[in-house]
Amino acid sequence: MKLLRLPICAALVLALVPPPAMAEREGRDDMTVLGYVEDVHVGKLGLEMKGKLDTGADSSSVYARDVKVYKKSGKDDWVTFRLRGKNGRTVRYDQDVRRFALIKLKTGGTIRRPVIHLPICVGGVRGLAEVNLADREDFEYDILIGREFLASRVLVDSASTFIADDECNVSERD
């Protein structure tokens, strides 16, 4: 009799617990599915950059040129930098530094990078991303979008690229 109790209890538990796939999908109907590479519209002017949606990265990073940190009014940290879009157009930005991030390098050691808030739109998903300014010249993608921006907004299809409809409705103008 004791031998029958264990299989019956196990069957009851399995019947009451939803399969993992079903549990994971709850609450995700309103999320946008995007490829792991998409066009990302950056800043108020909608500068278009080729970006990687990286679920393996916590934070976001953008290839910024001519980065110079300075004190505004002698106290607050500000940064001036340039971003270049896919079409070669360059836009200069000047804004406050939210914080500085220590980034671990693959070669060992760390580097200190300024972090800013940058409006972005990808596949119609808009938001303010916390982005560190980096020299990404040796990387294939000018902007990397990490989990902090993607969470609760985007599901990334790792087998697809450029599947987003252009729902950002921005034009590259000055």
Where are these regions (language model features)?
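Bacterial N-terminal signal peptides that target proteins for export
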Residues: 1-10
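N-terminal signal peptide c-region/cleavage motif recognized by signal peptidases
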Residues: 18-20
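Pepsin/retropepsin-fold aspartyl endopeptidases
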Residues: 22-174
